[in-house]
Amino acid sequence: MARRSEGKKKRKILTDRGVVHIKSTFNNTVITLSDADGATILWSSGGTAGFEGTRKGTPYAAQLAADKIAKEALRLGIKRVDVLVKGPGPGREAAIRTLQAAGLEVDSIKDVTPIPFNGCRPKKKRRV
């Protein structure tokens, strides 16, 4: 007898709150929507928005990725989000503005960019 393969089970989202993680680098912007525990619900990036190469790092690519996340979040019933921003890229502000404009209520914006407390020695000319 053939075994039935079990696919991924979609979890029902029971809350109207979520956390949006925006990781913005100079090459790309990755936006992830998770629940309060940190479990990923959905994600999008400059690449999944249809951009390739250096255009993935543009604010416009981040805007399209954030719009996709916001529309899907509203469809799932998530209305209020906390935003955690990481990285120095150009897509940070564009993504936050798009989330607000799309109808999500942004409760807080927090910068969680990792900064070393005198960690590893920078290479060559990068020493300041």
From Swiss-Prot:
Keywords: Ribonucleoprotein, Ribosomal protein, RNA-binding, rRNA-binding. SUPFAM superfamilies: Translational machinery components. PROSITE patterns: RIBOSOMAL_S11 (PS00054). It holds the Pfam family Ribosomal_S11. GO terms for biological process: translation. GO terms for cellular component: ribonucleoprotein complex; ribosome. It comes from the Bacteria. Part of the 30S ribosomal subunit. Interacts with proteins S7 and S18. Binds to IF-3. Located on the platform of the 30S subunit, it bridges several disparate RNA helices of the 16S rRNA. Forms part of the Shine-Dalgarno cleft in the 70S ribosome. This is Small ribosomal subunit protein uS11. It comes from Pseudothermotoga lettingae (strain ATCC BAA-301 / DSM 14385 / NBRC 107922 / TMO) (Thermotoga lettingae).
